[in-house]
Curated annotation (Swiss-Prot):
It catalyses: tRNA(Met) + L-methionine + ATP = L-methionyl-tRNA(Met) + AMP + diphosphate. SUPFAM superfamilies: Anticodon-binding domain of a subclass of class I aminoacyl-tRNA synthetases, Methionyl-tRNA synthetase (MetRS), Zn-domain, Nucleic acid-binding proteins, Nucleotidylyl transferase. The lineage of its organism: Bacteria, Pseudomonadati, Pseudomonadota, Gammaproteobacteria, Alteromonadales. It comes from Shewanella sp. (strain ANA-3). This is Methionine--tRNA ligase. Signal peptide: none annotated.
Amino acid sequence: MATSQRKILVTSALPYANGPIHLGHMLEYIQTDIWSRYQKLRGHECHYICADDAHGTPIMLKAQQLGMAPEEMIAQVNKEHQQDFADFNIAFDNYHSTHSEENRVLASDIYLKLRANGYIKSKSISQLFDPEKSMFLPDRFVKGTCPKCKSPDQYGDNCDACGATYSPTELINPKSAVSGATPVMKDTEHFFFDLPAFEDMLKEWTRSGALQTEMANKLDEWFEQGLQQWDITRDAPYFGFEIPDAPGKYFYVWLDAPIGYMGSFKNLCDKHPELSFDEFWAKDSKAEVYHFIGKDIVYFHSLFWPAMLHGSGYRQPNSVYAHGYVTVNGAKMSKSKGTFIKARTYLDHLDPEYLRYYYAAKLSSRIDDLDLNLEDFVQRVNSDLVGKLVNLASRTAGFITKRFDGKLAKIADTTLTDAFLAKQEQIAEFYETREYGKAMREIMALADIANGFVADAAPWQLVKQDDQQETAHQVCSNALNLFRILVTYLKPVLPRLALDVEAFFQQTLTWDALNQDMAGHEIAPFKAMMQRVELEKVNAMVADSKENLQATSEPEAPKGPLATDPISDTINFEDFAKIDLRIARIVKAEHVAEADKLLKLQLDIGGETRQVFAGIKSAYSPEDLEGKLTVMVANLAPRKMRFGMSEGMVLAAGPGGSDLWILEPHEGAQPGMRVK
């Protein structure tokens, strides 16, 4: 056991209950599962809990489209999610749903405490209302013409074409995305959480070490912009929890979603009376609470969530750890390319241990995006897991079984064993600090040493010589003991392989048993533990992931982009000459808080720096853009936006969403050059 046992509660973000798990999701659950398994391997009391995020307008509408009750749909999705996670060897101690009695009670409790403490405000607001569906329309459920650039079919909060942000009421010719009806304005009373009241507490907490440096720096920007009152209300019809004392008013999904962590743990406590909910969540709790999340939901977890907990008398998490996005072959996951891969599709073709190892080998404590390069995936799995790790046992175990009664010899020279054991604290530190890539490199470096030892000793030659039998016994026993140590180090990453190795050694692999003397220990006959991954299987997985495109029944219809976006009316040369296009280098790119589609760009145009807000967040992460050359409209009148002044426009092509590409000039171009 560990010298000082810790009490730990760890969570992953709750997957939304309106669709399947994909490999982008799996990064987080694998990352968290490795950390949880490591804590348990060290003898700590660690509870890994999660749940489906099961409320909101999207779920209500999708259930209607499927002709199902929302409760029926989320139950079905929950079952599918749990099966996917189980097959990826994600070892939750409890998996629940935010649509639960535990969560309803806790959400109401927290709200009522916030209200009693003066942190809930009420005011009347005007919102767009769908007269056909008799429902208020959230931002994303209204579409119309952008009030800034006049582009049609834009959402109610942000324009894909020009990057402008606005309120739904500013749209030209707005239409309900639910029914197509023209919405009307209607007043409604909403409740707001007084987030600005917690600014001092949040500034202290975010700089306490609870967040990664990159996250804390981003929060400083949000503090500079000023915290806003947070609307926690949605009007009926809505699938969620009704707000106490407010008939027809429901909690916004982001209020009860993080409370789902508490609800799932309460459900676990009810199953295990020896567990105390208050021991982990009371204000004076000495237990540890950690949240693993994606970088896209930092705002909710590092501002709203700790403020809600503090204002209602609960403890704050020790840390919130964010990770980046998953790209495939250097690009955003794409359905048409077959790189938007569902967890189930992967499982139909490949061993989950492969992906667990590959993600671990590339994960760090930073918020960098992780690229799943499929060719590198094949090479790394085959080289590290099959060629180095399992091969160490496969080429030595047979000699022990056939020639030495299956029993290991006492190692006379422990130099290698001592060197392997000397790495345990460094590897432990890497696991603890989520530097999994560094841990994998240390472990594989040891595997190289072990394989070199076997290759140099050549036991297959020694067993042929009568006077070298004891040496052969020593070499093979030493190799297998090194293999045991390596797999123990890898047990959090490769749990199924660890089970196979435990069956082979006929004992449980534990951290405390790393230095166990294995002399005289009997092993079971060796069985194949891991197969090489073939590129053909990977290609078959990609083929199965490709979106089925419907063939058109009108062969003469226009094809390509012109089919949906015809060429505009002819203009005179004088009109074009008014536009000053310049080469610009993207010096810095940043996310914009509370903007779903915007990135803030700092552009060098040759002796002058411009700030531009661009609606390209769906296609690019900031780090992908920095250093690139692009083309900007340099003489566009500056436009004051909610987030600052935009001093131009960058050019991009594509229909939108993930299929959007900024223009990149030839490398010979220089910032400031005119495009003619």
